[in-house]
A protein has these predicted regions:
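Conserved GNAT acetyl-CoA-binding A-motif
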Residues: 79-91, 226-241
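Conserved donor-binding loop and adjoining core beta-sheet/short helix segment
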Residues: 25-79, 187-201
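Short amphipathic alpha-helix that is part of the acyltransferase structural core
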Residues: 1-28, 123-157
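A structural microfeature
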Residues: 49-51, 108, 184-187, 215, ...
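Conserved acetyl-CoA-binding loop-helix of GNAT-fold acetyltransferases
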Residues: 68-80, 205, 211-227, 250-254
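A conserved beta-strand-loop-helix scaffold within acyl/acetyltransferase catalytic domains
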Residues: 54-57, 160-180, 185-204
Length: 269
């Protein structure tokens, strides 16, 4: 594995290995320049297959160009790596079988759900027992992000580094759930704006508060605070949820979110 030194080198590799019919999950083309400038992009090339690695705060993400499913790669000294495959419909068994032979194991499946405001159920969790508000203090953002990072897989769970906390505070991107008198932190929600779409990045609830409607209260607050007063009925929302998390899936479905036939499966090593 070697560092990619410039964008021309990256382009040359993509052109060489990005042949017609190849299997690829290379989603980094638009950010390749930035990754190279940060010395965060590496590559491991073989006769017919190539693998890019992006250094993250914890571990690495791998992106591949696979032209030959019989050509083995030497990943013996590579650890703490996640590879994520986007798919619609059937699970991409060819890539999964190849990657498992190279030492990866299946981690989890995430499904994308979406809705417009007009499709969503009215709030049913407004209760005096749970108070939801925007995080106004750095310490509140810090507490929320620690909960997110502790609740989700550190390789595939979108780890939030401390360097992002101030930006999250400045942009009002964190919602906090408290008990009635604000003496107990119950949970948090991280939201992202992608164009005209309001996206849930993370939702997590403290263990002692689970099963008490905290997650529903956070989602309801997220929906209401982001509705567009001029086009309220058409305000758009999206989220990703682990397919294995049946309680969360049911909560979103009951709210009115629909699966849009877009999923990812992650494998880790």
């Amino acid at each position: 594995m070697k560092k990619v030194d410039n964008f021309s080198e990256y382009q040359a590799i993509v052109e060489k290995y990005g042949q017609k019919g190849c299997l690829s999950n290379d989603y980094i083309q638009q950010e390749a320049v930035d990754l190279i400038l940060r010395d965060a992009l590496y590559v491991d090339c073989y006769g017919k297959n190539a693998f890019f690695f992006v250094k993250k705060e914890i571990g690495m993400r791998m992106y591949y160009y696979i032209n030959d499913l019989t050509e083995n790669a030497d990943f013996c000294n590579i650890h703490d790596v996640v590879v994520e495959i986007l798919f619609r419909g059937e699970i991409p068994n060819a890539e999964i079988e190849y990657l498992t032979k190279q030492g990866f194991r299946i981690n989890l499946i995430r499904d994308q759900y979406a809705a417009m405001y007009k499709d969503l159920a009215e709030n049913s969790t407004l209760t005096s027992e749970v108070k939801v508000e925007e995080a106004k203090l750095y310490t509140a953002v810090e507490t929320a992000c620690k909960l997110f990072n502790d609740s989700f897989d550190k390789l595939s769970g979108d780890f939030i580094p401390a360097s992002e906390y101030q930006k999250l505070l400045d942009t009002g991107s964190i919602l906090i759930a408290w008990n009635a008198d604000k003496t107990s932190f119950l949970g948090a929600l991280h939201q992202v704006k992608e164009g005209a779409v309001n996206v849930i990045g993370h939702v997590a609830v403290m263990k002692h508060a689970r099963g008490k409607g905290v997650g529903k209260a956070l989602v309801d607050a997220f929906v209401e605070r982001n509705k567009n007063p001029e086009k309220m009925e058409k305000t758009r929302y999206q989220l990703w949820v682990q397919r294995q998390n049946e309680a969360a899936v049911k909560m979103y479905q009951n709210k009115g979110f629909k699966y849009i036939n877009k999923s990812t499966i992650s494998l880790i090593k």
